[in-house]
Amino acid sequence: AYEPYKIAPVTSAKKGIPKPLMSVLVFILAFLVAFGVRYFYKNTATKTLQGTGYTMTAPADIEKSSSTNLYALDNFSNNEVGINAVKLSYSDIALYGYGKGESASDIFDFILENGSTTLKITGKDSKYIYYTQSIGDKHYYGMSSITEGNGGYYIFDFLCEQKNKSKYEDKFKDWAASVEIK
C-alpha cells in the first residue's frame, strides 16, 4: 500500500576518514611508535659488562674503548658516557699507610692527595665523589665510586658532558651499585 506521508530515508555519502588521510595518519602513528620504542630502548636498555675482575650493569650500547690511563683496567664508552675502571691493590696503598678495610672516603682522600688531577670536586659522601672537569672547550660531569674486593679497591669513574648531568647522575649511581667483584 502506498503511504504518501512516509518519506524514504536519505542515504548520505560514506562516513569516515578518507583513505589518503588514513594512510598518512597510519604512517605518522607507525613513525611515532618506532621512535618511541627506540627512545625507550636507548634510555633504559642495559647489559652486564664483563670487566677485569668485576661485572656491572651499563647502557646496552656501551663498548670497550682505549685509554691513555696506564692504570686503567678497562674503559667503556658510547656517544654520551664513559666508564673507567682502575684497581689499587692493597700492596699499592700499603706504601702510604692504607690497607684492607679502609672506608671509601679515606680511599678517595688518598687518591685526591696523591694523584695529579685537574678535577674540581663538587661533592663527596660516604659512597661517591662528584666532580667537574674541562677538557678544551668541553665541560664534563663525573662521579667516582669505590668497591673493595679481590685484593684491593676498584675505582669506577663515570663521565658525561655537563649538559647531560641530569640525565645520567642517577644512572651513574645505579651502575655503581650494580658492581660485583669476582
Where are these regions (language model features)?
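Conserved polar/disulfide-associated segments of primarily extracytoplasmic proteins
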Residues: 67-155, 160, 164
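N-terminal targeting sequences that direct proteins away from the cytosol to non-cytosolic compartments
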Residues: 1-78, 148-152, 159-182
